[in-house]
């Protein structure tokens, strides 16, 4: 079946007729679903001309009290009774077929690419070779991307082939488009949504910031197909999210907690999901979401296509993979060993807690010599985040804070101010900053060191993205001594100069591989009191973000 043909021709020629029969035969009326999909749920759903518009609104989740919650249980799946669906759309381009095995291996070696599994498709080298339908290819070209990234070159053929797959690559390497574009092709091959239908594509993400960014990409590239999406996350009113689900969306991007809430209160279901994405799986597990992930995935038909994306490959992710992926193929860009990008200059200063504030200001003066610079500062706690921001603002630095105690509209506003450069200094906690993809961050400053080396690598990875250069400054105190050995190892691997003051912590921590240790006490901001914690009802700016600005430094 060609996916480059006009929609009208495809549908008027009944190329999807088999789907109509499958769904009209009451496949969803079996005990698995309690008869909620009656015999004619999809009757005539494929008739007529599609004309480029995905009609067939979902909706109608009624029949349950607003406050009624039903605990999710694992369905007993009978695959023979489920309607069949298409998931292999890959047709290898002649230029790709013509490449010899030695040429393929040379390409993979050049891009530090390793593949594991059976019958792995060859990588592509250009957008035209990917085999996308014209309506997807045109969207990509309109965005002006010069060529696919390494993960896209191998990830697209894998995803389009319908195989379960694992993609491991650094944050900022183009993973989102690696699953977003194939999902559009997948959706357009499925029957239209009917009343009461949930999404066809489900993307799980660890944080609301990352979920929103994924939604922006899906909206951008799904526009020509009129594919609808929604973003389901906590910390925001449920009303609009519920209305989106009731109207029907083909793509749902969600954080695990809020999605379970929507499922247990009957606001949506996962019966139609045939394309599942777990994005930043390592961070979701680090944040304790494994029980929620398992509960959600158990609600999805087991013959779905599952795509797992991660920046690292810890044992916990491997276990999840064995439990939920079927004969997966895997692509890794770079080393499986934890490593920092070689395009980032790492500077570590060993000092006392009382020296940190002065050193922070000195580094800000250096960073902002470039008037276009964006600086991301990490603190260990929400309180410290607010106190650093208040101090910087009083000293004339245009800083704003983002952390979990800020309301969602304020977090969105802070992120916009930072992205546009109106407030080029952002102070954040780890959870708030995870997944934030802001172009042009030139400096990352670890005012407080993280508790483990994985978080250090994730933090400094906010700069030096997509081949650009960046600088990461870390203020290291005696309280961080247990992190010393791993920090020295990361710096050496990236060919960075390890300061002599740090080497004594390397000897003290020799052989350590701290994964979840807290790295000793973190130290505090220095007894600054509790001011600046109010939420502020009069507008976006709460607490530290509403602190008065001194004479602006730059």
UniProtKB/Swiss-Prot annotation:
Keyword ATP-binding: yes
GO cellular component: cytoplasm; nucleus
Residue span(s) of domain Helicase C-terminal: 346-506
Pfam families: DEAD (PF00270), Helicase_C (PF00271)
Compartments where located: Cytoplasm; Nucleus
Annotated stretches, region: Disordered: 521-554
Entry keyword set: ATP-binding, Cytoplasm, Helicase, Hydrolase, Nonsense-mediated mRNA decay, Nucleotide-binding, Nucleus, Ribosome biogenesis, RNA-binding, rRNA processing
GO biological process: nuclear-transcribed mRNA catabolic process, nonsense-mediated decay; rRNA processing
Binding site for ATP: 169-176
EC number per UniProt: 3.6.4.13
Residue intervals of the Helicase ATP-binding domain: 156-331
Gene3D superfamilies: P-loop containing nucleotide triphosphate hydrolases (3.40.50.300)
Main localization category: cytoplasm
Protein name (Swiss-Prot/TrEMBL): ATP-dependent RNA helicase DBP2
Organism, scientific name: Meyerozyma guilliermondii (strain ATCC 6260 / CBS 566 / DSM 6381 / JCM 1539 / NBRC 10279 / NRRL Y-324) (Yeast)
């Amino acid at each position: 079946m060609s996916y480059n043909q006009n929609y009208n021709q495809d549908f008027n020629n009944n190329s999807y007729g088999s789907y109509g029969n499958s769904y009209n035969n009451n496949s969803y009326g079996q005990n698995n679903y309690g008869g909620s999909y009656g015999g004619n749920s999809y009757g005539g759903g494929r008739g007529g001309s599609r004309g480029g518009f995905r009609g067939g609104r979902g909706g109608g989740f009624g029949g349950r009290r607003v406050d009624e919650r039903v605990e999710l249980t694992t369905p007993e799946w009978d695959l023979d009774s489920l309607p069949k669906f298409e998931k292999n759309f890959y047709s290898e381009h002649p230029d790709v077929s013509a490449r010899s095995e030695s040429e393929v291996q040379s390409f993979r070696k050049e891009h530090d690419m390793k593949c594991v599994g059976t019958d792995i498709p060859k990588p592509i080298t250009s957008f035209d070779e990917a085999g996308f339908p014209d309506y997807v290819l045109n969207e990509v070209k309109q965005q002006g991307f010069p060529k696919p990234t390494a993960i896209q070159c191998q990830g697209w053929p894998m995803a389009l082939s319908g195989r379960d797959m694992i993609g491991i690559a650094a944050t900022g390497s183009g993973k989102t488009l690696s699953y977003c574009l194939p999902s559009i092709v997948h959706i357009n091959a499925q029957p239209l949504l009917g009343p009461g239908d949930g999404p066809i594509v489900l993307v799980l993400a660890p944080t609301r910031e990352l979920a929103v960014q994924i939604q922006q990409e899906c909206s951008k590239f799904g526009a020509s197909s009129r594919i609808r999406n929604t973003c389901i996350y906590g910390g925001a009113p449920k009303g609009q999210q519920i209305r989106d689900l009731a109207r029907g969306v083909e793509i749902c991007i969600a954080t695990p907690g809020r999605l379970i809430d929507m499922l247990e209160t009957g606001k949506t279901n996962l019966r139609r999901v045939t394309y599942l994405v777990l994005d930043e799986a390592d961070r979701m597990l680090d944040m304790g979401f494994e029980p929620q992930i398992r509960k959600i995935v158990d609600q999805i038909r087991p013959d779905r296509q599952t795509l797992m994306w991660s920046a690292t490959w810890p044992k916990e992710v491997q276990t999840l993979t064995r439990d939920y992926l079927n004969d997966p193929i895997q692509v890794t860009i770079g080393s499986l060993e934890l490593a920092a990008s070689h395009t980032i200059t790492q500077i570590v200063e060993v000092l006392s807690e009382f020296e940190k504030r002065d050193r922070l200001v000195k580094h800000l003066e250096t960073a902002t010599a470039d008037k276009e610079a964006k600086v991301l500062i990490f603190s260990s706690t929400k309180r410290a985040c607010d106190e650093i921001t208040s101090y910087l603002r009083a000293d004339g630095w245009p800083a704003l804070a983002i952390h979990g105690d800020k309301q969602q509209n304020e977090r969105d506003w802070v992120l916009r101010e930072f992205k546009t450069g109106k407030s080029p200094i952002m102070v954040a906690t780890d959870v708030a900053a995870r997944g934030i993809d802001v172009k042009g961050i030139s400096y990352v400053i670890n005012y407080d060191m993280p508790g483990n080396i994985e978080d250090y690598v994730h933090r400094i990875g906010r700069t030096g993205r997509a081949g650009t250069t960046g600088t990461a400054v870390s203020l290291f105190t005696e309280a961080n001594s247990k992190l010393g050995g791993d920090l020295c190892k990361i710096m050496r691997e990236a060919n960075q100069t390890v300061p002599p003051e740090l080497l004594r912590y390397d000897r003290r921590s020799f052989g350590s591989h701290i994964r979840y240790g807290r790295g000793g006490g973190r130290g505090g901001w220095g007894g600054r009191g509790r001011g600046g914690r109010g939420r502020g009802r009069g507008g976006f700016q709460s607490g530290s973000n509403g602190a008065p600005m001194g004479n602006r430094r730059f």
